[in-house]
């Protein structure tokens, strides 16, 4: 202890500085001499690289030619395979937004960019177009940097992007595949359904993704369980390891406790690149095995990730959430009046439209739901407003799109044949509970539904096999739909 001295003493660099002063000129001359040698070596390496690139191009040319012939064959003989849910670009008075689906059609993404993001906004006209998201366009997006000037050009014929002094890339508009349209219709309808919402801190999303990266499940279940208790931190349990993450920064403020289980959790890795720049995430949950939406707040931008109930349950074929949307009887005059009022501002909330038109809010929501199912209106989950978004200049083939599932067609048949009997209607805290029976192939099925004040289906039950197997994860059965129509 007597000789112990832990005080900080800076290094004495006097000798080093003196040596550096004596040898500085010699070192500088040596550096200049080596620079010329390195420049010569670099030129030789560049020449070799160019020669190797030429040889590689010659070797791969037969492959590229065969690939081109294959894509041309798909284009002319199997157009649906050639086109896979490509992005939609919409220009609005307040923002530009891009929408797309994943290749397996189970994930939906929407990037909204306020006009404040851009230094200069030229002459613009509001509208929607769609393009083919090719590899060339993807590579051009990867060049975007904060220190480079990026130019976006959008017109009805396509989309162009140019970064810095690089040559720009122009992607042309393509035709709309049927599954592409149906996927957007289902997403628009799902966004209008009742949800449990919670604010998540970016580090909480990071912790979920981090644990999923560290572990790989070899047996089921492969689910995330969100445990929501009012006034307490959100808890997330990862199955099958039963690991619980306490999101201390994220407090649930909902009215009642909820436990919601979702699958297809590895799709959350899509959000990883946004975690460092996100100010927060808003999570919207519909229910067990139902879709979930993650909204990343990025300042003047926002990104919405919509996940179907599980990976195999894609948006365009197995999700029938348009059948759960508000279905109030709205006359044609009111429909056109609501749509015209929305088109005046291009985006507006349902309460604001109702006040402006002196109309009941439930009627406005039902009218907007009709246009959502027609592909003319989109619900913006991040802003809480409805937006004009025409998927096609021509009227969509709604009969083909609407009856991709036979359940609603069967429900229409039950109504037309007068096989539906409404036995009771009573008001509850959740809404109106309707009970009745449907005669299907000489078998009487008892069914019941609960419809809230916005005409949305909140709960339902039936005696049929479809409901016992799927509950509401694939939408209501034909007996519930018929009962709702008859009431």
Which stretches of residues belong to each language-model region?
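Long, low-complexity, compositionally biased intrinsically disordered regions
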Residues: 1-487
């Amino acid at each position: 202890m007597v000789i112990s001295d832990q005080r900080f003493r800076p290094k004495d660099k006097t000798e080093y500085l003196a040596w550096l002063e004596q040898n500085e000129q010699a070192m500088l001359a040596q550096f200049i001499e080596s620079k010329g040698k390195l420049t010569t070596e670099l030129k030789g390496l560049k020449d070799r690289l160019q020669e190797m690139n030429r040889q590689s191009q010659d070797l791969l040319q037969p492959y590229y030619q065969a690939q081109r012939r294959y894509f041309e064959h798909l284009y002319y003989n199997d157009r649906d395979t050639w086109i896979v849910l490509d992005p939609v670009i919409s220009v609005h008075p307040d923002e530009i937004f891009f929408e797309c689906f994943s290749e397996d059609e189970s994930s939906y993404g929407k990037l909204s960019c306020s006009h404040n993001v851009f230094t200069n906004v030229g002459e613009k006209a509001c509208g929607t177009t769609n393009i083919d998201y090719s590899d060339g366009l993807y590579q051009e997006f990867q060049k975007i940097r904060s220190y480079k000037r990026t130019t976006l050009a959008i017109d009805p014929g396509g989309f162009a992007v140019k970064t810095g002094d690089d040559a720009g890339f122009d992607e042309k508009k393509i035709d709309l595949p049927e599954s592409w349209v149906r996927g957007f219709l289902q997403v628009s309808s799902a966004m209008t359904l009742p949800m449990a919402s919670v604010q998540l801190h970016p580090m909480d999303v990071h912790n979920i993704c981090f644990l999923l990266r560290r572990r790989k499940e070899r047996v089921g279940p492969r689910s995330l369980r969100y445990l929501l208790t009012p006034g307490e931190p959100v808890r997330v349990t990862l199955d099958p390891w039963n690991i619980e993450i306490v999101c201390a920064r994220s407090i649930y403020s909902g009215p009642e406790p909820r436990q919601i289980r979702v699958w297809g959790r590895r799709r959350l890795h899509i959000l990883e690149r946004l975690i460092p720049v996100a100010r927060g995430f808003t999570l919207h949950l519909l229910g067990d095995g139902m879709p979930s939406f993650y909204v990343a707040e990025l300042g003047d931008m926002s990104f919405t990730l919509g996940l179907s109930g599980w990976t195999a349950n894609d948006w365009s074929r197995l999700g029938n959430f348009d059948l759960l949307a508000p279905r109030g009887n709205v006359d044609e005059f009111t429909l056109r009046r609501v749509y015209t009022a929305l088109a005046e501002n291009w985006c507006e909330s349902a309460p604001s439209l109702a006040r402006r038109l002196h109309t009941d809010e439930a009627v406005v929501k039902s009218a907007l739901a009709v246009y959502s199912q027609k592909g003319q209106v989109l619900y913006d989950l991040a802003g809480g407003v409805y937006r004009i978004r025409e998927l096609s200049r021509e009227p969509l083939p709604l009969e083909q799109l609407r009856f991709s599932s036979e359940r609603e067609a069967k429900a229409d048949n039950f109504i037309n044949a007068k096989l539906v009997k409404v036995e009771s209607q009573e008001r509850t805290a959740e809404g109106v509970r309707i009970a009745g029976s449907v005669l299907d192939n000489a078998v009487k099925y008892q069914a019941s539904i609960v419809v809230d004040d916005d005409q949305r289906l909140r709960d339902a039950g039936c005696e049929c096999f479809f409901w016992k197997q799927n509950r509401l994860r694939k939408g209501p059965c034909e007996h519930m739909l018929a009962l709702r129509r008859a009431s």
